[in-house]
Design a protein with these regions (language model features):
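A ligand-binding cleft/hinge motif common to bilobed small-molecule-binding domains
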Residues: 103-112, 171, 178-180, 207-239
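N-terminal export leaders
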Residues: 8-12
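N-terminal signal peptide c-region/cleavage motif recognized by signal peptidases
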Residues: 24-26
Length: 328
């Protein structure tokens, strides 16, 4: 009999605690947000995550009635920002905006990673996707991807390509393309697109992958030529430029930009931000503004965001193996 009353007492305590948590959660959701929200950005001002974050932050602030600030913490391919995010208060007022490399590439190439995606973070929302474009210098005698493939196979190792750094999406996209088609093209890594794109324009390398905003001015001036993009389909920004997937079915390395929170962040905060981000992604002016920058708005739920990260981990893991990159 005593055990019966003990069990009943434990059950009642649990019920009371659960009810208290439910009330607390409901109160939080009703009041949220009641102070400024901060977006930690993994890259410097002007980069892809920064561009996307600022456009969304402005609309998010208008919809929530609270300031949404942007805090750039570039360095180590997003590791600096991710570490700061993992240590930030888990109160629903700090989020991180990053491209997929923070969680899909870094764990594959770094031995000293201090964070773990599944342990330390939770997906909130997809925000955008930005295809990279394969661009060549005008002196490169190839007017389309098939001609470039033929040229590379005729001159094994004779052509060069630049990238924004070893292990970058620019690097891994080309390595996957090379492996898929059996090409030998020499890699010349640079420290960011601020170095790699000028190297292409100056003829120091024959080709590279980069985002449209960093190339479009040189395309218009005739200093570089676009041959293909690395997304699953043609982009509305450059509909005459084919997707590599038209030659290699399933080829898709277009980087995503998404919002994440630290594990332990209130579910109500995550749900609210996710819902608002999805609504913002459908705003015509947001779609157009991003499109003008060569970026596609793609609102997506927390579950869709999480799935996209896992898909990138799988896809880029294969590319890292193909490139022979060892953890350092």
């Amino acid at each position: 009999m005593e055990s019966f009353f003990r069990a009943r007492r434990t059950w009642m305590i649990g019920m009371v605690a659960g009810a208290a948590l439910a009330v607390t959660g409901a109160a939080f959701a009703q009041a949220y947000p009641n102070k400024p929200i901060k977006f930690i950005i993994t890259h410097a001002a002007g980069g892809l995550p920064d561009t996307v974050a600022r456009i969304y932050a402005q609309r998010l602030s208008e919809r929530l009635g609270q300031p949404v600030t942007v805090d750039n913490k570039p360095g180590a391919n997003g590791m600096v920002a991710a570490q700061a995010m993992a240590l930030a208060p888990k109160d629903g007022y700090t989020f991180m905006v990053t491209d997929g490399s923070t969680f899909s590439i870094n764990p594959l190439i770094s031995k000293s990673l201090s964070y773990d995606y599944k342990r330390d973070f939770v997906a909130v929302s997809l925000a955008a996707r930005a295809p990279l474009y394969l661009a060549v210098h005008p002196k490169t005698p190839a007017n389309n991807l098939r001609e470039l493939i033929a040229l590379a196979k005729a001159k094994p190792g004779g052509l060069t390509y630049g990238s924004s750094g070893i292990g970058s999406t620019h690097h891994l996209t080309m390595e996957s393309l090379k492996a898929s088609l059996g090409m030998e093209i020499t890699h010349i890594p640079f420290k960011g697109t601020g170095q790699s794109v000028p190297a292409l324009v100056g003829g120091q390398v024959d080709m590279l992958f980069s985002a449209l905003p960093s190339l479009i001015g040189f395309v218009k001036s005739g200093q570089v030529r676009l041959l293909a993009n690395n997304a699953a389909k043609r982009s509305t920004q450059e509909p005459n430029v084919p997707a590599i997937a038209e030659i290699i079915p399933g080829f898709d390395f277009a980087p995503i930009v998404a919002v994440f929170a630290a594990s332990g962040t209130p579910a109500a905060a995550i749900e609210r931000i996710s819902t608002e981000m999805a609504a913002i992604a459908k705003m015509p002016e947001v779609v157009q503004t991003l499109s003008n920058a060569g970026i596609e708005a793609i609102g997506g739920s927390a579950a869709e965001c999480h799935r996209a990260v896992l898909e990138e981990v799988d896809r880029l893991g294969k590319a890292v193996a193909q490139a022979g990159i060892q953890k350092e």
